[in-house]
């Protein structure tokens, strides 16, 4: 059955108060995409609700214009049958939340891949986006006399442009990150609550974010939200993929019965309680995923330090933006192994020991099966 005259509905991906997201196939062109469709009908292109939708999309189009591989590609918004719609790439995969729930323990190379891809994507929003959004005439940027395709931007001007054009995602959580099935790469989704230059991209400036990922300052005053609020939520994501769970757990049943009380408890956690150390939780996740093996710490101490700095209660004690997080991670990764982890050789030897124990156990099980098969065959021969 045709949907909005152009699409075949495949299934609902998600639904919120403002819009529903469908997986669809274009009837004539055959491509498969996701489309965000407003729940409420609008009268025409002059309807304030549609204009608000367009304002949201203006920045989102520049963020998700296909220039960054780890940000979902967004296409031109339109009005069809009195519904505001915008197409975006359909990401065939699972959410980070689903991935962690399935794996229990995420291998360290996957943790670093997540850090490389999602932290870099957020750094693009917090910092590099000015290169695509700035207007040389409005921003009074001079061209390079030796190369008219380039601009002369000193450090002070760059910082002004970063402050003006930085986009705060404002809704980072593990259901807004996807892991592609075909190559395992991570993709950042849903900028519907994004904020630029202190103003909500979407007309509704409601405080954004899932409770487990909200920075302490968000509970007090949504007007103080900045890139450092995103850094806190990013720290929760990094903590979650390394530890196998978020630092502060929300009791779903308590939230359903009394969301106000549960929300207040979560606020107290974020404001007052230090995050639990990561290693015991990572050990627990490892043992759940690998019950016959011995856990050995497999990540450098500096990684936990980076995460804990992201999770500082005071925004001033965090990184200023995701670019600083990304640069710090890359700096540590580029250090020589001897300075990164004094116990790396011992850890490698212990892993080999674990592998040998596992293979020995598997071989023993195989021999038992062979013996049982042999005994069964002898018994059958005796009967014959």
Q: What are these language model-derived features?
A:
Residues 42-64:
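AlphaC helix of the eukaryotic protein kinase fold
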Residues 204-218:
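Conserved activation segment of eukaryotic-like protein kinases, specifically the C-terminal portion
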